[in-house]
Design a protein with these regions (language model features):
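Catalytic loop of the DD-peptidase/beta-lactamase superfamily, centered on the K-T-G motif
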Residues: 2-41, 134, 180-185, 189-193, ...
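Intrinsically disordered, highly charged
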Residues: 2, 506-514
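Short hydrophobic alpha-helical membrane-entry/anchor segments
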Residues: 494-506
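An acidic site on a long C-lobe helix of protein kinase domains
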Residues: 106-109, 171, 242, 246-249
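Active-site-proximal loop and beta-strand segments within enzyme catalytic domains
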Residues: 9, 21, 33-36, 45-169, ...
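Well-ordered alpha-helical segments within folded domains of soluble proteins
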Residues: 70-71, 171-176, 251
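Secretory-pathway/luminal and periplasmic proteins that interact with or process carbohydrate-rich
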Residues: 38-40, 96-105, 118-126, 188, ...
Length: 514
């Protein structure tokens, strides 16, 4: 590992600050620069009982970072002329059907699936909300059903494609199935032969094979009495989150993403194709970075970033790249609830900012406020009525913008005290309709919040930057509607486990190694 130009003291201090809020059994962090792993930091253990230390070859479940790899596979088919991103996905999907809620819906395309705008529901059926891991997993050791069996009744399209952003594991599972149906090669084998193999990722796989099994970390959640191992499950919608990998292998992957599709071992995509994946393919508003093809777009200081996080019970992962600087960070933790509230994402962001010479992510406090616009901004904003396409954001019930203590604030109907009390909207420049909120307690640093207007100048919507969600303003509404209470009650149950980790019982874990 080449550590030249890396300020280890600053990196470890920033990591330590995150871990003081999000304790873990084990954490692995890799910094990629100049096409290789420039710095590695291992903290804690892969398995508490065995005392196995974290190292570069510890295997983690990378969860939804898998989606970026699935997107690479789709774009390989596009380069070969085997698929067209704007052709209906059903033209390539043989294993099961996509079923629109209304016959007049436009067809869902591969581009829609790659940007979470296909209208695919987050759960196969409402009863999945009551199942472990939302019905996405099956106990380890049991047969994993084929997607044809898993979606035997078809996969439902609940919103018209192209009209709404809603994060969907099932959409990326469908992309993986399309890769299999078009190539004629099982998806796991396809990734081994055409992505992992060319990039030298010898300790990565879609399934729990001999390539990954012996070095696999144990996943934990933090309970009031300490760390507890999670129930081990396999991911059924594999293209959405099933890959196992190591810090070393994911550093090789990041090097290829920063190297125009190639690293020192080989090439998986052409530079122009990869560049197109990083460009905006969905933006609810031009001020929101939005989505590329399989990647979230963002900003670190003046530097554009592309990234993806992953969440699975007991595991959290993050990949964040600053392509203009040829720099990337991968981070993996084997501790965390099935919610975004955990260490890997904040660690990756903090490390990248350190490498780029940036201070910690914070709102700008010296920007003058513009109260003249507050009156038209205040009110209730909702995701709107209709089918529950994505239960996680819909748990907000409604979002209220109001003036509290002489500041503009945003308040959500969700059982998180800070959000229910209200988060201050800090002005983010001269634009009176652009703000930032401070989210350090949620592992997200800051997030942009912008308001859009119709041609007549009336405020019609609010858009979030942390995920490209849009909330529509409800003129004259005094509350989010009677369904908000139900959403709030449902979210209280669903989020309860995700907040148990906030207990700050000390956990004895050995220190880090470089």
């Amino acid at each position: 590992v080449e550590t030249a130009g890396v300020d280890e003291l600053d990196l470890k201090a920033r990591i330590g600050e995150v871990l003081s809020r999000w304790p873990v059994a084990g954490l692995a962090v890799g910094v990629v620069r100049h096409g290789s792993l420039a710095w590695f930091h291992g903290h804690g253990v892969a398995d508490i009982a065995a005392g196995t230390p974290i190292d570069q070859d510890t295997v983690f479940r990378i969860a939804s970072v898998t989606k970026t790899i699935t997107a690479i596979a789709v774009m390989q088919l596009q380069e070969q002329g085997l698929v067209d991103l704007d052709t209906p996905a059903s033209a390539y999907l043989n294993a099961y059907r996509l079923i629109p809620a209304r016959p007049g819906f436009r067809p869902a395309t591969l581009r829609h699936l790659l940007t979470h705008t296909a209208g695919v529901r987050a759960v196969r059926e409402p009863s999945d909300l009551l199942r472990p891991a939302l019905g996405w997993g099956t106990r380890a050791g049991r047969p994993v059903p084929s997607l044809a069996g898993y979606y035997r009744g078809g996969l439902h399209i609940d919103a018209e494609p192209g009209t709404k952003w809603a994060y969907s594991n099932h959409g990326f599972a469908t992309l993986g199935q399309i890769v299999e149906d078009v190539s004629g090669v099982p998806f796991g084998r396809y990734l081994r032969e055409r992505v992992f193999g060319p990039l030298g990722m010898d300790h990565s796989d879609l399934v729990r094979s001999g390539r990954v099994r012996t070095r696999l970390a144990t996943g934990y959640v933090l309970r009031s009495r300490g760390l507890k191992a999670v129930t081990d499950r396999e991911v059924v919608p594999a293209g959405g989150g099933s890959v196992y990998s190591t810090t070393g292998d994911m550093a090789r992957y990041a090097a290829a993403l920063l190297g125009g599709g190639a690293n020192e071992h080989g090439r998986v995509l052409g530079p122009a194709t990869l560049a197109a994946m990083f460009e905006p393919s969905y933006q609810p508003d031009p001020r929101i970075p939005g989505m590329g093809l399989g990647f979230f777009r963002g900003q670190a200081g003046a530097h554009p970033t592309v990234s993806h996080d992953g969440i699975w019970p007991g595991f959290h992962s993050a990949l964040v790249l600053a392509p203009d600087q040829g720099t990337g960070v991968v981070a993996f933790a084997n501790t965390g609830p099935f919610s975004p509230l955990a260490a890997a994402g904040p660690v990756a962001s903090a490390v990248l900012r350190s490498i780029l010479g940036l201070p910690g992510d914070a709102v700008r406090t010296g920007v003058p406020e513009q109260p003249r616009a507050w009156g038209e901004l205040c009110g209730w904003y909702t995701l709107g009525p209709g089918v529950l396409t994505d239960p996680q954001p819909r748990m907000l019930g409604g979002v209220q913008v109001s003036v509290r203590h002489d500041h503009l604030t945003i308040r959500g109907q969700i059982p998180v005290p800070a959000v229910r009390r209200g988060l201050r909207l800090y002005p983010d420049g001269d634009d009176p309709y652009a703000f930032r909120i401070n989210l350090p307690g949620f592992g997200s640093g800051t997030s942009s919040v912008v308001f859009s207007r119709d041609p007549n100048g009336h405020v019609t919507a609010m858009h979030l930057g942390v995920q490209p969600l849009s909330f529509q303003k409800r003129p004259g509404a005094q509350n989010p509607g009677p369904w908000a209470a139900g959403a709030l009650a449902a979210s209280a149950v669903a989020l309860a486990a995700g907040h148990r980790h906030r207990a700050r019982r000390a956990v004895a874990i050995k220190g880090g190694r470089t």
